[in-house]
From Swiss-Prot:
Protein name: UPF0421 protein SAOUHSC_02103
Membrane topology: Multi-pass membrane protein
Statement: the UniProt record of this protein carries the keyword Secreted: no
Domain of life of the source: Bacteria
Subcellular location: Cell membrane
Organism: Staphylococcus aureus (strain NCTC 8325 / PS 47)
Transmembrane regions listed in the UniProt entry: 19-39, 61-81, 108-128, 132-152
PANTHER family the UniProt entry points to: ALUMINUM-ACTIVATED MALATE TRANSPORTER 10 (PTHR31086)
Keywords: Cell membrane, Membrane, Transmembrane, Transmembrane helix
Other facts noted in the record for this chain: Disruption of this gene leads to an increase in hla (alpha-hemolysin) transcription and proteases production.
Lineage: Bacteria, Bacillati, Bacillota, Bacilli, Bacillales
């Protein structure tokens, strides 16, 4: 059995959050400090990567200090029983965090500011310093836990999403070619499927960026970088495929395109060969069909007629070329 089964059951990030909360509470209690403010800071500081934790933590600390400062200031002016204290503390904290470009720390700063108001009483300086210290404890603890415990590995998620993207792309390309053969240039169904694929590929690229950040902060073997580069190249090819696919989905309204019998057969064979990649694991070349479409494009360029048709066939050939290179 996998010795890391618990990570699949709970989630590494959840485990790290729990550890960070526990250690933060231990440190604060050992120093006789109220742990709640440090825990709030620790919870929001756990990020997908160690780099993100360090960068955002660097901005959250001054934001928290700002929030604590305004809480003390307005409690001194209006007392802890006034609605103005809460409203002005939150408003000015948000305003200053925005002006100083500390937006990533706004949430924890506002929470800290509002939570500490009832306990300030007359100990203004002490509460300000203690809240600042607890914020530092929360930031440092969660940052170290995120860096040292269960360094994120997104390879599995990336490969899974890439495979899903491939399958959806190939299927949509096949279905879209069927629509074009039947002269259905506008298709809400294809547009919806395209948006789903586009969003899925964005998720892939986000995970790849997370993994690249993680590798840059940890000493990793050359094979890790090699695998990441392979996944990056695959995602880049998918991005190009999706771009060309969009160009045969989003076509001008009120246009008509008619294909000859040979052109329809060529589109059918090319789209079928691409759809079957997911099932066969290989790419069947359709050289004769490709040549048919190339000849049509050349003829249209000479005559200068039906540019939409030429555009569609060109995009189909570009998609074919991408996969021809991938499976060369």
């Amino acid at each position: 059995m996998n010795d890391q089964w618990y990570k699949h059951l709970i989630g590494a990030r959840t485990i790290k959050t729990g550890i960070a909360i526990f250690l933060t509470a231990v440190f604060c209690m050992a120093l006789d400090l109220t742990p709640i403010y440090a825990i709030l800071t620790a919870v929001v500081t756990i990020e997908p990567t160690a780099k993100a934790s360090l960068i955002k933590g660097y901005r959250r600390l001054p934001a928290t200090v700002i929030g604590a400062g305004f809480a003390v200031l307005f409690t001194y002016l209006f007392g802890d029983q006034s609605p103005f204290t809460y409203a002005l503390s939150a408003t000015f904290t948000i305003l200053f965090c925005t002006k100083l470009k500390l937006q990533v720390g706004t949430n924890v700063a506002v929470l800290t500011s509002l939570a500490m108001i009832p306990g300030i009483h007359d100990a203004y300086i002490f509460n300000f310093l203690s809240r600042t210290l607890t914020a530092i404890i929360g930031l440092v603890t969660s940052g170290l836990i995120n860096f040292m415990v269960f360094p994120p590995k997104y390879y599995g998620q990336v490969e899974e999403k890439l495979s899903k993207t491939d399958a959806l792309m190939y299927k949509l390309f096949y279905n879209r070619c069927q629509e074009l053969i039947l002269s259905r240039l506008q298709s809400d169904k294809s547009e919806k499927a395209y948006k789903n694929i586009f969003n899925l590929n964005n998720q892939v690229e986000t995970l790849i960026s997370y993994q690249r950040d993680e590798l840059s902060y940890h000493k990793k073997k050359e094979c890790d970088w090699k695998l990441l580069n392979q996944l990056t190249k695959r995602a880049y090819t998918n991005r190009l495929f999706i771009t060309h696919l969009s160009n045969i989905i989003y076509l001008p309204k009120n246009t008509r395109v008619n294909f000859s019998g040979d052109e329809k057969m060529a589109l059918l064979k090319i789209s079928s060969s691409i759809k079957d990649i997911f099932y066969d694991g290989s790419f069947k070349r359709e050289d004769d069909s490709v040549e048919t479409l190339r000849s049509t494009i050349k003829a249209l360029e000479i005559s200068g007629e039906n540019q939409i048709k030429s555009h569609i066939l060109y995009e189909v050939l570009m998609i074919y070329r991408l996969l021809d290179s991938r499976y060369a």
